[in-house]
């Protein structure tokens, strides 16, 4: 399962099931800026270089909320985050879950401003014209939320970092 932010524009192209989680954009900040930058709003200045992944809601959020900052876009999340670690950019704007994991895997190399500054419901995307599948997904989500399965999955992947050890 992959995250896709449910937006009005995307909803013109595909249908969405009900959201299964709500996330938002957060900031990975270059070391040395933590006293100067306390919020994403502080980055809206031409002296700062902000990076994000091309074509994502991070890209859109940076353009919308940080229009005065210099913006550079990358093909992958990792390329953008590495720019911040290497001091070539001041901040990386991207999905909170990615930024939380990346900062925990790179302790002392950057600062995570972990309060999301956007509202982004994630949902499964389904091709137009398949209401039965959307209905099935919605019923499935309701079932696992009601029987405790959703809470167990959420705890494993979002409240614990034990799974990260299996990545190495």
Task: Enumerate the predicted regions with their spans.
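Conserved active-site loop/cleft motifs that coordinate metal ions or position small ligands
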Residues: 93, 125, 153-154
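A ligand-binding cleft/hinge motif common to bilobed small-molecule-binding domains
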Residues: 3-13, 61-63, 83-86, 90-118
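Ligand-binding clefts/hinges and TM-proximal coupling segments of bilobed small-molecule sensing domains
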Residues: 57-71, 112, 142-168
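Periplasmic-binding protein-like
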Residues: 22-29, 96, 100-142, 160-168
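A cross-domain feature marking catalytic cores of carbohydrate-active enzymes
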Residues: 4, 54, 154
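Acidic, polar ligand-binding/catalytic clefts
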Residues: 1-42, 110-111, 115-117
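Bilobed "Venus flytrap"/periplasmic-binding protein-like clamshell domains
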Residues: 26-81, 96-98, 131, 136
């Amino acid at each position: 399962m992959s995250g896709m932010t449910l937006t009005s524009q995307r909803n013109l192209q595909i249908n969405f099931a009900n959201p299964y989680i709500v996330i938002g954009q957060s900031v990975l900040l270059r070391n040395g800026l933590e006293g100067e930058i306390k919020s994403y709003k502080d980055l809206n200045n031409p002296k700062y270089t902000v990076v994000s992944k091309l074509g994502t809601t991070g890209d859109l959020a940076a353009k919308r909320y940080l229009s005065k900052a210099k913006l550079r876009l990358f093909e992958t999340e990792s390329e953008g985050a590495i720019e911040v670690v290497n001091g070539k950019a001041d901040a990386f704007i991207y999905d909170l879950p990615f930024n939380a994991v990346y900062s925990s895997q790179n302790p002392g190399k950057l600062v995570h401003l972990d309060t999301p500054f956007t509202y982004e419901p994630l949902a499964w995307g389904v091709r137009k014209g398949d209401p039965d599948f959307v209905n099935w997904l919605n019923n499935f989500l309701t079932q696992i939320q009601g029987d405790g399965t959703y809470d167990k999955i959420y705890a494993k992947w979002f409240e614990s970092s034990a799974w990260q050890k299996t990545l190495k």
